[in-house]
Amino acid sequence: TKLYYRTTAAAGTCSTSLPDGPPAAQPFCWQPYTSSVASSQIVTTTTDAGVTVPLIVKVERGTMNRGIYDIAVLVSDPTGPWTALAPQAGWNRKVYYTFGASTGQPRRQARPATNWSTQEAQLRRGYLVVQNSMTDSARNSNRVMMSETVMMMKEHIADTYGPIQYTLGTGCSGGSINSNMNASIAPGLLDGIITSCTYPDSETTTMEVADCTLLVAAYHKMRTTPLCRDVSQA
């Protein structure tokens, strides 16, 4: 578990890449926090619960159900305790779960496709943001295992951080499939979903794409075309 603070650098002048990743062309928007960092260097935010605090987040990285996960949450007291029975005031008790896009079954561990450092808007409002590579569609196409991983992550959050008011799921393309499939496989696991570039599932989407390819080929190579070449259209 590490602490990071949001610098006062304006958007577009700093990199939203993970601060513990490879060097970026611009300075990182998020920097490691220590008690020696001056408050003037840290952005201040007000959560949707009306709590105003410096924008400092606690980031937990671990493994769950074979996937690598990241959890980031706003802290109101960087050096103070946090228990499930006494969560810090920076968290609004809401969870924002991001599902990664694409589709695949590589059968290997990898870090989540979505970086917590890009979800500043949610962190500013007090949401706990979470990702797990086993809930990224590019890393795992077993939808039952994916839903099981979401359940295990929620259990870990409740045990470690405190009771959850509600959980929002979000994602694009394969991420939208996982959001929708959660609602089908385990109703109630997600209290709401916000999807973009949405598909219902991988099976019906694949059939539609395959049909389109075959039909386009057929229309361009119809055997009846020569018979109709000199026929006037009605």
Predicted feature descriptions by range:
Residues 70-118:
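Short, surface-exposed "cap/lid" segments of acyl-processing enzymes
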Residues 141-161:
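Alpha/beta-hydrolase active-site loop
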Residues 162-173:
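Alpha/beta-hydrolase fold nucleophile elbow
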Residues 101-106, 129, 135-139, 173-177, ...:
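Solvent-exposed loop/turn segments at secondary-structure junctions
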Residues 190-234:
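A catalytic-pocket lid/entrance helix-loop region that shapes and gates access to the active site
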Residues 93-102, 112-135, 146-150:
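Active-site machinery of serine-nucleophile hydrolases
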Residues 176-187:
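Short glycine-enriched nucleophile-adjacent loop
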Residues 1-91:
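Catalytic-loop region of hydrolases
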